[in-house]
Amino acid sequence: MAKNIKRKNFRNDNQLKAIGEKIRKFRLAKELTQAELAFECGDKDWSQISRMERGLVNFNISYLLLIAEILEISPKELLP
C-alpha cells in the first residue's frame, strides 16, 4: 500500500531567476517591451512577464513554450 506522502510546493528560486533572466535577454534582443510580450502571450497585463523575469512566480511549461515560440527560439534556450 502506498504511503501517505505530503506534497511539497516545488519552487526553485535560483532556477526561476535564471529562466527569467534568459526571457529578458531574448525579449530585449527582439526589441519587445514586457507589455508587447504579454500581449503576444494573450495577457492584458505586463506584470506577469515582469514577475517571471525577476524569478518571482512559478509558471507552467505551456507558458514557457508559448514565450519561446513568440521569441522564435527553442524552449531549451530558456532553461538554466
Predicted regions and their residues:
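Short amphipathic recognition helices of helix-turn-helix/homeodomain-type DNA-binding modules
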Residues: 40, 77-80
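Residues within the helices of the helix-turn-helix
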Residues: 24, 35, 65
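Core residues of bacterial helix-turn-helix
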Residues: 12, 30, 41-42, 70-71
